[in-house]
């Protein structure tokens, strides 16, 4: 259960952005904020997703011994421009906060958390959906039905430079050895509407490599030594379902 709680806190976007706040130890946030400009190879349905207002549900689940267990669910909505986002926790009920609002320009944004009906203001980094800004090489893998809709399923994978991200955020070379992780994705696209309906991300390798990075930083050991201590047998995935695209979405930021 301890490993699963760590996965839950660190892998869901909003939780991952906020989880390290107030922590005394150095821990890697498992968010995906190493952002590059969109390039000409990005398909229309993906670029449209990045620039649309929409509602979504994210579920983080683990697969172990052929048993799938959903460990966290959040629901949210996004206003693309100017950026606003609202997230509420559906599961687990014992979370320290129940809902959060994000707003701001660029990568540095403001978050307002509802903690037991008391608002807390924090500065944080904007979280982007997995794959944003990466040089994705998408390929059509198959056709599969999703919620009764025949979808084209595209696959992609990209490499995350964890060493570079950690050192950039800290402003110094905390880790001197390379640590990289491969993130694999599946995109379910409605070809009739040319819309992204669902994105499934396998973050298992990133989960393991992040645990290795945390060991290197907190235990002052080498990457090779940390690899011997870390063993992640679970497959960790995040499923992001687009519930609706809606230009009329309006997010009211609480006044505090």
Residue map of PLM features:
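Short, hydrophobic/aromatic-rich segments at coil-to-beta transitions
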Residues: 51-57, 81-88, 147-155, 171-172, ...
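Beta-turn initiation residues at beta-strand->coil junctions
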Residues: 60-65, 88-93, 111-116, 158, ...
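Gly/Pro-enriched, hydrophobic low-complexity segments
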Residues: 150-256
């Amino acid at each position: 259960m301890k490993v699963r709680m760590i996965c839950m806190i660190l892998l869901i976007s909003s939780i991952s952005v906020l989880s390290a706040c107030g922590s005394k130890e150095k821990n890697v946030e498992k968010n995906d904020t190493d952002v590059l400009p969109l390039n000409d190879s990005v398909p229309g349905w993906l670029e449209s997703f990045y620039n649309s207002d929409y509602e979504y549900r994210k579920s983080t689940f683990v697969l172990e011994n052929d048993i799938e267990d959903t460990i966290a669910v959040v629901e949210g909505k996004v206003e693309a421009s100017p950026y606003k986002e609202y997230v509420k926790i559906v599961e687990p009920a014992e979370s320290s906060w129940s809902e959060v609002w994000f707003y701001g320009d660029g990568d540095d944004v403001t978050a307002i958390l509802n903690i037991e009906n008391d608002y807390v203001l924090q500065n944080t980094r904007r979280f982007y959906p997995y794959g944003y800004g990466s040089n994705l090489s998408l390929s059509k893998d198959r056709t599969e039905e999703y919620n009764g809709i025949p979808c084209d399923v595209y696959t992609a994978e990209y490499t995350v430079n964890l060493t570079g991200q950690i050192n950039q955020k800290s402003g110094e070379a905390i880790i001197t050895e390379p640590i990289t992780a491969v993130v694999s994705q599946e995109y379910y696209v409605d070809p009739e509407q040319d819309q992204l309906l669902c994105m499934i991300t396998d973050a298992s390798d990133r989960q393991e490599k992040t645990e290795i990075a945390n060991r290197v930083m907190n235990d002052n050991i080498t990457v090779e030594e940390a690899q011997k201590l870390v063993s992640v047998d679970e497959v960790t995935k995040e499923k992001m379902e687009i519930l609706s695209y809606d230009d009329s979405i309006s997010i009211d930021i609480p006044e505090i």
